[in-house]
């Protein structure tokens, strides 16, 4: 097994896409290659075919490599909650909620064991592992607590390439600072530097690059330009703020940017629909001039409901529900309830709270363990939102709580999964303009999505498109190959050929 590792001078330097790019290129050349990130902190997660939970970033990287996602590609997933606490997912399964200091001081041994096991597991099926670090390897205040950078490089004897983000400014200082803050023993592992997200004429960088190479004796092997045409899933809400959605189209679908928004990749397929613009709306924004509103997932339904009330969005949503479709996904679906019952305060200190009351149902927490699984079913009946009876849908569930329906119709008859409650019979609910589901990825179903957007087109006096081709599905592979080509055309690929020969 050969290990190649990308570490960054900072968070959001481009490590995730750099790993995806190299995985894509190596896969296209016939190598058996897998991505790996020992520890990831993210609110965007995914359920695998084995019903394991992992970061969406490693899912994206595995798709770029053309392989099935596996939780061993991301053995430790930290999902931030409140007050310096995260839910810790180990090899796809919840290990509990832990405070940061408790995790670092008391869980480290178990975490390292899981990382070693996952690396060993991947050896069976792959020849090359492309590893992504986390944040910066030069966090000297907690260097001895590292679980994602040089510890993993030592564990795998990996060659390290440092990725630096020039778009943030100060790229040369960040390269030199990172390099010299790393202890000499680990510094020797750094074999090259890539400058990422460059805009303009690369010739202006030559004097700086020459000085960097003189100071570090490390070659700069590539300058990757900033490419705004790439359309790939975002890993976290920080990246979401810079994501370029299509706006100013004939139809505007608002997506409510909840304070604790999660799994916002659910909306990605809508961005590929002709005539459709996606507008991220704050809870403080005016919600007028929208043609539909999506309330996405959240890592804390109760706390975000409280924020909706404080901001005034609570009443705004109730008002516009009489005029436009409102679609809730997972936590957003739970918010549509009359009440959310949380007697044990498992979600927050507020306990039970009033919901938006747009669907006659009640959501209860503390009744079941977290649901993590892939799901499928069929739409139960035709609706004014465009959905048609017997349309097949798939998705994945990542939720706590059950939802008990009152005088309201379920949306989906379940073939596989849990849905609203332990019976596993039905998921979601629909009444007039308002609809919701526990299925993440619901809009990744082309027929379901197209029926919904065609109804929006009809509502606006536009011609429906019908079931033509799925631009989202086709564009994913195109985008992954475009990412790989961008890397290959701007990086010295002979460097990697030499690494693989060693």
UniProtKB/Swiss-Prot annotation:
Listed GO biological process terms: cobalamin biosynthetic process
Keyword GTP-binding among UniProt keywords: no
Keyword terms of this UniProt record: Cobalamin biosynthesis, Glutamine amidotransferase
HAMAP family reported for this sequence: CobQ
NCBIfam families per record: cobQ, PRK00784.1
Record's function text: Catalyzes amidations at positions B, D, E, and G on adenosylcobyrinic A,C-diamide. NH(2) groups are provided by glutamine, and one molecule of ATP is hydrogenolyzed for each amidation.
Protein name: Probable cobyric acid synthase
